Structures are given as C-alpha cells and as structure tokens.
Regions:
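Gly/Pro-rich hinge or "lid" segments in bacterial periplasmic/extracellular proteins
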Residues: 91-92, 172, 189-263, 267, ...
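Bacterial signal peptide processing site
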Residues: 39-41
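Extracellular/periplasmic solute-recognition and catalytic clefts
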Residues: 241-252, 269-329, 337-338
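A structural "hinge/loop" feature
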Residues: 61-77, 101, 128, 144, ...
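Aromatic- and charge-enriched surface segment that lines or borders ligand/interaction sites
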Residues: 103-151, 186, 282, 329-331
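Surface-exposed binding/hinge segments that line
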Residues: 117, 136, 147-214
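N-terminal lobe/hinge region of extracytoplasmic solute-binding protein
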Residues: 58-109, 231-234
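Alpha-helical secondary-structure segments
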Residues: 131-138, 182-188, 236-237, 265-267, ...
Length: 346
C-alpha cells in the first residue's frame, strides 16, 4: 500500500504504459510472497511439532479415500485407524487383540455366538452415543452388493453374511448380527472361528455414522461426500480437520473419545511422500518423525547412524513375476524353468 502511494505521487513523471507494466509486476510479486507466506505458515518441522504435540508422519502415497468400507490400501489404513475404532483393536504392545469400542465380550460354549458389550462412554465425535445398531447398519453397508466393497469377506464368518453379499438372500435380518439393546451386539457365526475377534480389528468392520451416510447419499453410494473434513463424524481417537490433496491430511485429538485422557498426541499430520529419496531427505532434515521405507543400500547406514530409532519389522507379502509366454524366448518352457531355478524361493 505504501509503495502504491509513492508510485501515485510519481505517476506524472512515468509514462502510462510503463506505469501499468510496473503495477502488474508489483501485484505478481505480492501474490508470490503471499503464497510463500501461507506455505511457511502451514509447514512444521519436528522440533516445532514436538512442542505442539503433533506427529509428522511419512504416510507414503496420497490415499484414494477414507471410507473404511471401500478403500483397501495400507496408506488409507493408517489414517482410518486414527479416525475410527472397531469392536476390537490390535495390541500396540505386541501380538493379539485388546478391547476397542467393545469393553468386553462373551463367547458361547460352542464358539458360535458372541455378545459384545459396547462401552457406555463410547460416542461419535458429534456427541451421539455409539450403539449396537450402528454396527448392524455398518455391517449391512459393507455387505450390500451395490456398494462394491473389496473386503466384505472380512465378515463372511458371520452367519449368512456371504449369502447376503452375493445376493443369494435379500433379507438382512437373516444375517447373524443383532442389536439386543443399545449397548449389546449379538453376533452369530456360521461355525466356530477362533480368528474372528482379530478380524474385527480390521478397518473394514469399523462402524460408520448412519445419519451421516444417509445424509450424503445412502448406504450404497460409493461417491458420497461424507468423508470430507466438514462432513465426517467418526468414533476414533482423532477427528479429520483438513485434507489438502497431495499435501497433507490433518487429524486432531477427539476430546469425546472414551480414552482421550490417555492420548499423548494433539494431532497427526499425514504427509503423502511417495518418493524414497524425498522421504529420506525429509527425515534427515527434521521434517518428519518417521521414515516409512528405507532404500536398501542405506539400511546398514541407518542402523549405524540411528541405532535407537531404527526398527526392522517383518512384512508379509506376495512377490511374483508375471511374464509374457507368447514371445521369444519366454515361450520356451526350458527358459522359464531356468529363470525359476535362478530365483531364491522362500
């Protein structure tokens, strides 16, 4: 503004053409400085984040979505478990599961019926109580054929769940899930399934807020806007406050969460860093608290430089080569056998 006043006073000594060009350039410079200023305000380093109780997390790629009944990726999983909570959860201290939204459960003698007691203080982020009926609705949603979920089989151990998902039966009342009262959920399995409680820690079985789902298109709408920050209502330890595509997803401590007193973090910033070199640079320069994947050639270096921080975790996966057997020389079975013999089989 001051610069503009000075130029206005000197305007009679400047040609109109040069004056207009100069004003446009000044405007462009101001826009650039504004953008840089906003960018700097939004960025945090580890030192600043520590003071605010915020975790800066290298989360790999940009998530495809945040609907627990539709997405399938590891990237999405990390965010969803911060926003939602199922009946059980993975034990962060080791193997097995621990109570989540359900404070306890009773298994019948034949192992086919389970009664889950949902916590009295378990509520949604808007204050609505979390009920057994919310789980009935949510499981009906993931099993609804029109939704096209990729993980409906996570509930196939439930009586008639597979049949409903495949359209063999139309009445969901025949599926083995029932709200006995507001806080008691009865699940009937097709047969004794020892690993079922562990399956319930998977985000595909998590509850969604029925009123919100209905508000934004209904139970089978895949393109719903309910996962936007302004719309999402969740039941986990954090709530969604910002989703800037390809930049950051921010979640903030949910003060209504039943175990909020034990939450050490005030928030998490999930950063989509899909380049290993960039991730390495971010970690070393103090822009993230973690490094998701270490480049193979740098593993020993990190073990030496960061012996306390370095963690080598097991990862179960399937790795394979798919080859075109119609082209030379791969159309020769002897060549393919030779390739097979050259590989290390685990």
């Amino acid at each position: 503004e001051l610069l503009k006043r000075i130029l206005e006073k000197k305007r009679r000594f400047i040609s109109p053409f040069f004056y207009n060009v100069l004003m446009k350039k000044i405007g462009l410079i101001l826009i650039i400085f504004t953008i840089i200023g906003c960018s700097n305000q939004e960025s945090l380093d580890v030192e600043s984040a520590n003071k605010q109780g915020i975790l800066l997390l290298d989360n790999g790629t940009e998530p495809q979505g945040l609907d627990p009944h539709i997405v399938t990726g590891v990237t999405e999983h990390k965010i969803i478990i911060a926003l939602f909570e199922g009946l059980t959860m993975q034990n962060p201290q080791g193997e097995g599961i621990i109570p989540g939204a359900a404070e306890s459960w009773n298994i019948s003698g034949n192992g086919k019926e389970i009664l889950f007691r949902i916590r009295d203080d378990a509520v949604w982020s808007n204050g609505d109580p979390l009920t057994a009926e919310d789980f009935v609705y949510s499981w009906r949603r993931i099993l609804t054929p029109a939704l096209g979920s990729k993980y409906p089989d996570m509930l196939y151990a439930v009586k008639n769940a597979e049949e409903y998902n495949k359209g063999l039966i139309k009445n969901f009342d025949q599926v083995g899930v029932e709200a006995i009262d507001k806080k008691v959920l009865k699940v009937t399995l097709r047969t004794k399934t020892p690993f079922f409680l562990k399956q319930l820690a998977h985000y595909a079985t998590y509850p969604v807020h029925p009123k919100t789902i209905e508000k934004f298109g209904g139970i089978s709408n895949r393109d719903s806007q309910w996962t936007r920050p302004a719309n999402m209502i969740s039941n986990g330890p954090f709530t969604l406050t910002e989703w800037s595509i390809n930049k950051v997803i921010k979640v903030t401590k949910n003060e209504r969460y039943w175990d909020s007193d034990n939450l050490k973090l005030n928030g998490i910033h999930f950063l989509p860093i899909d380049n290993e070199s960039t991730a390495d640079r971010y970690y070393r320069s103090g822009k993230t608290h973690n490094l998701n994947i270490i480049q193979t050639e740098k593993i020993s270096k990190y073990q030496d430089e960061f012996p306390e921080e370095f963690k080598l975790e097991k990862y179960f996966g399937t790795y394979y080569y798919r080859i075109n057997t119609d082209i030379f020389p791969l159309n020769n079975i002897k060549v393919r056998k030779a390739l097979s013999l050259s590989l290390i089989h685990i």
